[in-house]
């Protein structure tokens, strides 16, 4: 069989490089290097640290459960509960750091592709892996053996949808900006999904005696996790809080509500359910916002930036 040589096989027929394409010896390519800004990326590092500590605390709790089954002295339900509660607070800490890194980057004009990618990698650990392990612990260890696989499937589905949600966000962020100035999130953001799981687990752990089986609530956690996985990959729009105008009257009420929420979180009698209420309101708001009047949406937008 004869093989006809292509133009690329004949050196004499190859197109010559133009002067602009010829690499210049000693050329300065520093302008092509990704810009790394210190303060926003320190916040992202704090996010990643909290996620790592959350995963570590969950593993310690799981190890404690095995030691309790083996009858090792010194291990109690209370000590195991403390490990899981620490993991929940570390996830909340990651939410705060994640909020700060974006704010600082925008205020200082320091948004960059590097920061966006670094933030997504940290989010996979803090808001993907840690909540997935928390769900697998809360669900898997209490399900009947014949349907034990359900806990693993639900947990991994959440992690998978969270990672895909972050990948989609990065792709959309790299595209030209919306000419209408729409800054909404497409699908519930993974920090909010993680916060909802952590707050619900925190609520249930305080409603039941330490070491007591959650019973039917196991299946509620399964349904919530599946619902959050679907919402992360949905086209439901959620406010990003990027357009808060501190000079408006609505922002004053936003500050009042935020201060009140912080006070309730730190109050002994309300701290167990306040986070769950906050994350639930955000989740519901995204679902019902299209049904609200334009006037009400505009008023809420001035208050919460959405």
Outline where the language-model segments fall.
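Multi-pass membrane catalytic core of lipid/isoprenoid biosynthesis enzymes
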Residues: 42, 78-89, 107-166
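Alpha-helical transmembrane segments of polytopic integral membrane proteins
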Residues: 52-55, 93, 97, 131, ...
């Amino acid at each position: 069989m004869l093989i006809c040589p292509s133009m690329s096989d004949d050196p004499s027929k190859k197109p010559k490089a133009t002067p602009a394409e010829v690499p210049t010896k000693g050329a300065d390519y520093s302008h092509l290097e990704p810009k790394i800004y210190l303060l926003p990326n320190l916040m992202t590092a704090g996010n990643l640290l909290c996620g790592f500590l959350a995963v570590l605390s969950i593993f310690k709790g799981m190890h404690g459960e095995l030691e309790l089954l083996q009858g090792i002295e010194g291990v109690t339900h209370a000590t195991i509960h403390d490990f899981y509660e620490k993991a929940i607070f570390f996830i909340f800490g990651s939410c705060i750091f994640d909020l700060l890194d974006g704010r600082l980057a925008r205020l200082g004009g320091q948004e960059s592709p590097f920061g966006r990618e670094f933030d997504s990698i940290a989010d996979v650990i803090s808001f993907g892996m840690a909540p997935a392990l928390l769900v697998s612990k809360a669900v898997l260890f209490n399900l009947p053996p014949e349907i034990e696989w359900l806990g693993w499937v639900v947990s991994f589905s959440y992690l998978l949808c969270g990672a895909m949600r972050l990948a989609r966000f990065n792709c959309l962020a790299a595209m030209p900006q919306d000419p209408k100035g729409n800054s909404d999130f497409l699908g519930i953001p993974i920090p909010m999904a993680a916060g909802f799981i952590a707050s619900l687990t925190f609520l249930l752990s305080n409603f039941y005696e330490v070491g007591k089986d959650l019973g039917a609530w196991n299946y509620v956690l399964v349904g919530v996790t599946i619902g959050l996985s679907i919402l992360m990959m949905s086209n439901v729009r959620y406010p990003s809080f990027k357009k808060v105008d501190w000079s408006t009257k609505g922002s004053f009420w936003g500050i009042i509500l935020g201060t009140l929420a912080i006070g309730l979180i730190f109050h002994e009698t309300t701290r167990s359910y306040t986070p769950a209420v906050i994350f639930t309101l955000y989740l519901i708001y995204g679902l019902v916002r299209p049904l609200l009047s334009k006037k009400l949406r505009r008023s809420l937008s001035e208050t919460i930036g959405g």
